[in-house]
């Protein structure tokens, strides 16, 4: 009787070890996936909503194939503007490949937020300082081109403490 109990305990431990090993392998494969990295260029003149943003594929092995970027105006404090998703404009790929980013490549794009907020922004110039934005990238999963993956960036806010002001990652 004691041997069968010991054998059952051994089988349970073996099953748990196998499950932990499979979970570790799945986590390792998941961590190798490419994810887009976003940044903004300096705001030199004009509206903060006319800034050019940059997306980069920092993954050394896999491309971001068929990349589509959407800009999300998450919220503007003290306003009635609802969260809104808009497709990015003026996507310019560095290598001339209009379909995606190879490892180490980057592209630039703009977000048409002014169409949401309206013209002129001069009616409330602080609206950009109260805004929070993020980006949503959609691309093909490497090695499984028929499946798509989406990835949300961290939130950005207009940082006026740096000169010139720019959209930076929210602390």
Regions inferred by a protein language model and the residue ranges of each:
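Acidic, serine/threonine- and proline-rich intrinsically disordered appendage/tail regions
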Residues: 142-171
């Amino acid at each position: 009787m004691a041997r069968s109990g010991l054998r059952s305990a051994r089988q349970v431990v073996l099953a748990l070890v196998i499950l932990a090993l499979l979970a570790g392998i799945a986590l390792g494969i998941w961590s190798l996936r490419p994810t887009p990295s976003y940044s903004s260029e300096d705001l030199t003149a004009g509206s903060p909503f006319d800034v050019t943003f940059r997306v980069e594929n920092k993954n050394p092995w896999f491309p971001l194939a068929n990349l589509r970027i959407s800009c999300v105006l998450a919220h503007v404090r003290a306003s009635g503007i609802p969260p809104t998703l808009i497709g990015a404009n003026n996507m310019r790929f560095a290598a001339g490949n209009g379909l995606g980013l190879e490892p180490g490549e980057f592209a630039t794009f703009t977000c048409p937020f002014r169409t949401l907020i309206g013209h002129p922004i001069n009616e409330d110039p602080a609206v950009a300082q109260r805004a929070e934005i993020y980006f949503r990238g959609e691309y093909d999963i490497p090695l499984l081109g028929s499946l798509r993956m989406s990835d949300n960036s961290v939130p950005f806010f207009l940082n006026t403490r740096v000169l010139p002001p720019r959209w930076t990652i929210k602390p």
